[in-house]
Amino acid sequence: MPELALLEEVVEKVRPLLGQGKVADYIPALASVDAGKLGIAVTTVDGETLGAGDYLEPFSIQSISKVFSLTLALTLYEEAEIWSRVGKEPSGHSFNSLVQVELERGKPRNPFINAGALVIADLLQSRLGAPKHRMLELVRQLSQNDKVCFDKQVADSEYQHSARNAAIAYLMKSFGNFQGDVDTVLRTYFHYCALKMNCADLSKAMLYLANRGKSITGTELISQVQTRQLNALLATSGLYDGAGEFAYRVGMPGKSGVGGGIIAVIPGELSICVWSPELDGNGNSLAGTAMLEHLSQRLGRSIF
């Protein structure tokens, strides 16, 4: 376990970067977040959690939820059913691109861009009677926090600005790769993105990625092989168009969200969550990436 002093050092090291990024403003409910927040939490495979900075302040997890939705799909479907509808390759296009969906005849490149996550939400919608409730159950169980909830204001705000995601869903539907009612699936998808959690919650919830598929309670969520495969996808596609840069600087599987959170994993050791709302040009937390880079260097850890 890293010492508390190291986590505090990491937070202070990146503080001068504040003001260099830009808070997501295309979702009005996210635009009002205090840009000066910085938090980090780590959870070890022994179940111990440590944090520094604003690590107990809840934020909108946004695309980090795509890890939970894919994990949930892996518990409900045969893998062939999932991967026949969504690929495993980095996209090279923006996360909300329509161009690639058109060129590749409705099959998204990976489950972590919007098109891929919408297919996963479609799969969950068709197999679960109450997909929103099931997701809430899962993240509460994984984080050991019954207070985790959806931020209805954020979900509604995203739904009111959902033209592009609706266009992606209808385009995939035209190719036969979207089964459900678009409006219903979009509402489920936006609720997932609007989950509100803090760094401690997320570092605990993602521990299964560091612990061979076993959650903080020791329950097996997915198999050891599936965990390794999921980490591989996170390493290649978890950071939008910044995945290569992140692999170079941080060297860990990770997933970001436009709420400013990033989760990262050192397999066999610990899971990490950082948060700083200001984003870089790829939509990844600017100071958050720097915190992970500094931590990785100080711990001497990388999967490469």
Swiss-Prot record:
EC number of the protein: 3.5.1.2
Coiled-coil parts of chain: none
GO molecular function: glutaminase activity
Keywords noted in UniProt: Hydrolase
Catalytic activity as recorded in UniProt: L-glutamine + H2O = L-glutamate + NH4(+)
Domain of life: Bacteria
InterPro entries in the record: Beta-lactam/transpept-like (IPR012338), Glutaminase (IPR015868)
Binding site residues for substrate: S63, N114, E158, N165, Y189, Y240, V258
GO biological process, one term: glutamate biosynthetic process
EC category: hydrolase
NCBIfam families for this protein: Gln_ase, PRK00971.1-1, PRK00971.1-2
Assembly: Homotetramer.
The protein's name: Glutaminase
Organism the protein comes from: Shewanella baltica (strain OS185)
